[in-house]
């Protein structure tokens, strides 16, 4: 065997050992992430608490409130976040970096801090609380407060993903459409959104999942009022604090299954789009 062949074989063995190590580490990480969730859902299913919780008025009310508020918060997030993402990508202006940092700030803020900050703005003695109180408007500890808390903590996830998707769209394609007489709305609907749809969908899922699981800001700003501000994560906490571990596990399992179902649906949607693109190529 020549020295060069020996070196090649040795390098191949080293690379193979390194790859096996990486695969092993990846498997350990996957197990670390999946095992607690699997045990949670498995226990809820096997002991029957999941089925029982679906007949609980408290759980059903919290689930309905969670779905309703996250639908509203996601609508608000898209209505505000998508135009903002376009401006941040396509425009240059002084202080842009500061605005981007402010938008991303809720991602790293502890949720309880976010809730306290919202209370200092919208609370009865807050910055806007007194003027709103004069108008007869009270926001804290209402369903509106739940939506505001969800938008505050979840919008940055959508905006960040939308910015990445829009930045990947070739601006020359948009300019070409304008030259051909397309309006800004037509360019947006026929060029920007379709080409950035993957990133937009990912942002929607991340934002919705964050809103669905929101706890800290909600309990600080909106409270834990059954039928009014008690979302499903708050039921998990309330049942655990009350000593009903089975009910807490069941409510948590519903959250896991709902979030996982949406993630799977989006994966299937993106897989289907990829197949369509390949078929048309």
Feature-to-residue mapping (PLM):
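Membrane-water interface segments at the C-terminal ends of transmembrane alpha-helices
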Residues: 16-48, 57-167, 191, 195-216, ...
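Short coil/turn motifs that cap or connect alpha-helices
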Residues: 94, 172, 182-184
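Glycine-rich helix-loop "coupling/hinge" segments at transmembrane-helix boundaries
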Residues: 120, 217-243
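The alpha-helix within a helix-turn-helix
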Residues: 177
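Glycine/proline-centered hinge or cleavage motifs at structural transition points of membrane proteins
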Residues: 180-182, 194
């Amino acid at each position: 065997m020549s020295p060069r062949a020996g070196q090649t074989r040795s390098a191949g063995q080293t690379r193979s050992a390194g790859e096996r190590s990486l695969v092993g580490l990846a498997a350990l990480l996957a197990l670390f992430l999946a095992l607690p969730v699997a045990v949670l859902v498995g226990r809820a299913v096997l002991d029957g608490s999941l089925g029982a919780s679906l007949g609980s008025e408290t759980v059903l009310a919290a689930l309905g409130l969670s779905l309703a508020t996250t639908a509203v918060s996601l609508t608000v997030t898209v209505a505000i976040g998508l135009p903002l993402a376009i401006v941040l990508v396509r425009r240059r202006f002084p202080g842009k970096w500061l605005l981007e940092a402010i938008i991303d700030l809720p991602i790293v803020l502890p949720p309880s801090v976010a809730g306290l900050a919202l209370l200092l703005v919208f609370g009865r003695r807050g910055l806007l609380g007194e003027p709103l109180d004069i108008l007869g408007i009270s926001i804290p500890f209402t369903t509106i407060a739940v939506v505001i808390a969800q938008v505050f903590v979840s919008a940055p996830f959508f905006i960040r993903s939308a910015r990445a998707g829009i930045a990947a769209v070739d601006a020359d394609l948009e300019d070409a459409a304008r030259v051909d007489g397309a309006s800004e709305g037509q360019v947006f609907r026929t060029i920007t959104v379709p080409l950035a749809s993957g990133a937009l969908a990912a942002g929607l899922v991340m934002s919705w999942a964050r809103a669905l699981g929101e706890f800290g800001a909600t309990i600080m700003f909106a409270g834990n009022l059954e039928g009014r501000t008690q979302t499903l994560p708050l039921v998990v906490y309330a049942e655990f604090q009350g000593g009903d571990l089975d009910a807490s596990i069941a409510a948590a399992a519903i959250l896991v299954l709902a979030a996982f179902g949406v993630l799977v649906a989006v994966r299937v949607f993106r897989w289907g789009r990829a197949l369509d693109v390949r078929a048309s190529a």
